[in-house]
Amino acid sequence: MSYFQLEDMLRAGVHFGHLARRWSPKMKPYIFMEKNGVHIIDLQKTLVLADNALNALDAIAQTGREIMFVGTKKQAKNIIAAEAERAGMPYVCERWLGGMLTNFSTIRQSIRRMNAIDRMETDGTYDMITKKERLMLGREREKLMRILGGIATMTRIPAALFIVDIKKEHIAIKEARSLGIPIFAMVDTNCDPDLVDYVIPANDDAIRSIQLMVKAVADTIVNARALKVEQEVLAKMDEADGSEAEPEDPAAPESAE
């Protein structure tokens, strides 16, 4: 069973690629035709590849590991933030800081600083400092939150990345590849699919196309996590039933008179 309907993809404009003169020849296998100077993506191939990608994401999500959502372009950032939060996953929707993956220990220090400022507001520290100092701390926290808020709870590098627009997120791609982290991505006709482990040929500029794909990824993760919880509950119930069942004592032999 497919995660998508062809009609939904058509309505969302998933099939519209870039101008033919801006294409990447490596995307030729995923292009159906050229129309009015624009490449049209072969949605039959998108259906198959999207299903493969979502099946792989489902398997990762069931292990309990995290999948980072990445999309900082204007059309994607709000969608990325909303869907990643719904799925309980880390995300980057503002600027990608160099070293977010390859120098994660340093990034964690900035996250701890942000959390420390939060504690100051609740433990009474704010009452002991000047108004100017409170203002400076507030600005510092706001800046950290804008950039790092989406990964504030992340304690280790993610198991995979899902990316919208691999040309724009080239630093994230480079870092993930250097660490061997699987990359799932919407790949438009002007991109190099060889940089991605799981290619989803799709329009990465139209809001409706982005929404359709990102929502499907989030839905897959939510369902996989729910299944994992259900399986864990059933396993505990089976374990409890097994421990409560007491073996019957064998009948004592009658003594001979």
Curated annotation (Swiss-Prot):
GO terms for cellular component: cytosolic small ribosomal subunit. The keyword Nucleotide-binding does not apply. The keyword Ribonucleoprotein applies. InterPro entries: Ribosomal_uS2, Ribosomal_uS2_bac/mit/plastid, Ribosomal_uS2_CS, Ribosomal_uS2_flav_dom_sf. Residues 237-257 are annotated as: Disordered. GO terms for biological process: translation. Keywords: Ribonucleoprotein, Ribosomal protein. Residues 240-257 have a biased composition (Acidic residues). Disulfide bonds: none annotated. One of its GO terms (molecular function) is structural constituent of ribosome. Belongs to the universal ribosomal protein uS2 family. PANTHER family: 30S RIBOSOMAL PROTEIN S2 PROKARYOTIC AND ORGANELLAR, SMALL RIBOSOMAL SUBUNIT PROTEIN US2M. This is Small ribosomal subunit protein uS2. It comes from Chlorobium phaeovibrioides (strain DSM 265 / 1930) (Prosthecochloris vibrioformis (strain DSM 265)). The gene is rpsB.
